[in-house]
Amino acid sequence: MKLPLSWLSDYTDMNGITPKEYDAKLTMSGSKVEEVYYLGAEIDNVVTGKILEVVDHPDSDHLKICQLDVGKEEPVQIVTGAPNVTPASVGEICPVCLHKSTLPGGVKITKGKLRGVPSNGMMCSFQELGLSHGCVPYACENGILFLPASTPVGEDIKKVLGLDDWVSDFEITSNRPDCLSVIGLARETAATFDRPFSVKTPEVKGVGGDINEYMSVEVKDTDLCPRYTARIVKNIKIEPSPAWMRERLHACGVRPINNIVDITNYVMLEYGQPMHAFDYKCLSDGRIVVRRARNGESIQTLDGVDHDLSDKMLAICDNDKPVAVAGVMGGANSEIMDDTKTVVFESANFHGATVRITAKALGMRTEASGRFEKGLDPRMTLDAVNRACELVEQLGAGEVIDGIIDVDNSDPNHKRLPFEPDKMNALLGLELSTEEQVKLLEKLGFKIENNEVVVPFFRTDINRMCDVAEEVARMYGYDKIPTTLYAGEMVQGEFTPSQQAERAAALVCREAGFDESMSHSFISPKFYDMIGWDENDPRRISTTILNPLGEDFSVMRTTVLPSMLDNLAHNHAHRNPTASLYELGTIYTPTVKDGKADPDVLPHEEKILTLGSYGRLSFFQFKGVIEALLRELNIKGASFAPEKANLSYHPGRCAKVLIDGKEIGVFGTIHPTVAARYGLSGEVLAAELQMDALLAAIDPEKLYHPLPKFPASTRDIAVLVDDAVPAASMQATVEKAAGKLLESVKLFDVYKGKGIPEGKKSVAYSLSLRAPDRTLTDEECDKAMRAAISALETEFGAQLRG
């Protein structure tokens, strides 16, 4: 918010406070000043001058030679081509750039000649002085800026136009809507510099009459409009605002329009209370109804845009139609026009969340909506509407009808919190007396009654003792709070068991050449189709996002697989020949009610370790990564079993991961149809493992065995079996049949192709045999091998390969 420092002087003493000091102290007290700048910084050596004579240029049909009194001994001669400078302009006061003057944009003005006639400066238009439309009388918008006849001659133009002022640009946080006003910042300024602060109650004389004979107000949704205040002004005179008001509005970054609109903007800046003015004749039966909009209703707002309304929005209506979107913008059907004679001033308080939802839905963020969203004090509405009427009388812009319509359903009670000086000292690390704390709080409008802090209505952000303590710290000075070393006992942090397991799993993946990926928890329902899930699959039931970023982010995922395949596809599309990724992501399983996700119950969250790879690993190498993961986590009792029902995977190259017979995951080759939907070719591998189940299966005890004293004997075996026989089942048979001498068995080759009959495959294992107390003989090894081969032949019809 931009604020000219001179405006603060209406409410507090600013004498002796430099802009630099103001910037530093207000920022340290919590009201951050982004920038402080001088309004007239780019203007130098420009004064007011009175036109004494205007004659035609002898060698030009449009130039005029002027003599001007600029407060010096001799008049200054200036040649101008401005269309509004004529012999009739004699006596007018205007801005004059003297020799070696400067204008905004770095323009330098020096003496010169125009068509052979000396010109010792330049007469200025409002654009050349950096002013905007609305800051000057309409008659001066095309040509030289003429000033009021009472303007002194030879005066610095910066003082005349209100540019001899400093402006602070504040960054107001969302919890301090009271500081989005001159009065609010004046209160902060007075408290920070320990100066007096006062706000006069607006005084309205009125001209008689009774407002109730002109209009009525009905608030149907009091929860969305706690207070609605209105006054009527008749015999309105629409004209430019006085210079002092235009200058203040311009300094705050607001473009002046006319006196009535400017008054509403002025009061909003001064009090922080948005206002609106309706043309009374446009209100059917002089009636205002504050209600929810109806589906199908529409309104054209003051910016000329048509909007469709819904029943989630609050509207200001008359008997027939909406005339404003509450808290956002007025309607064009009740706009103040040049022929307006009677005006209704509205000053109301609207529910912040409703205004925010409405403004977002309509794509209309305004100065008013930005204030209402943060939560305003309902008690401001009365003072604001009276201040507007006071300004109307002060400017002679109309006649105020007696009476006020004030529909007040707001809570009349102050918020009260326990006053706990000792706790606040302990929290802040200070030793302030109770009297000191009370004094600091009272400067900000707080009161202490019966050991309670009475929170002022305008401080909607104060809810707890720590909030009150913060106010004490701000006024005491953050820079005065002594720095102290931490006095508590230092406790070494550690990872939780689940964090340790996740880090260990991630390490195994990285060591296996996998890169970590991270994806959104929001996906599109169409992704379930892409991974081949059946229409009746219960996993399709997902928690829906009410306000999604888009259709692709409309539900909470119940699987990470679509995100993994999408990331693999992204790499493949960018011609990356290989990619191996892992993600420790969360899935969200909803509570199902009547076949849908129950919106009143939060979904169950579960961590899933998902792996994906193409172009680098074979099926069995990928399986080896899973085995390494189980081994690193010290999980025993793990096994694998064929999985044919999972439609996302190839039915002949997919396995369930079991721990003590309970399924905790799946891995295998992605179904070619699914892979093709993602633009992937070749063998694409994936795995999905439940981290909670892995964590529960971790054996906390690790057993260490001494190094063997005797060597192992290694034997290889290759057999021919049907293609459908699972390698894991064969390995389990070998482990059981080979006896106690078997130390380990490892699958090292699976071959199908030349030399192998159709429907068959060659499977080769390496067996390691060892005895703890002796070196094994060939006979002992052969016996174990024969037992293993015999078991394979019996159970699977295996044929030993030569």
How would you name each of these model-derived features?
Residues 417-577, 715, 768-770, 780-802:
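Extended, well-folded interaction surfaces typified by the phenylalanyl-tRNA synthetase beta subunit core
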Residues 48-79, 258, 264-333:
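Conserved mixed alpha/beta core segments that line enzyme active sites in large multi-domain catalysts
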Residues 193-219, 396-424:
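Terminal amphipathic helices with adjacent charged low-complexity linkers/tails
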Residues 3-9, 165-173, 226-234, 367-374, ...:
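Short, hydrophobic beta-strand segments
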Residues 1-209, 344, 363, 367, ...:
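Phosphate-backbone binding interfaces of nucleic-acid-interacting proteins
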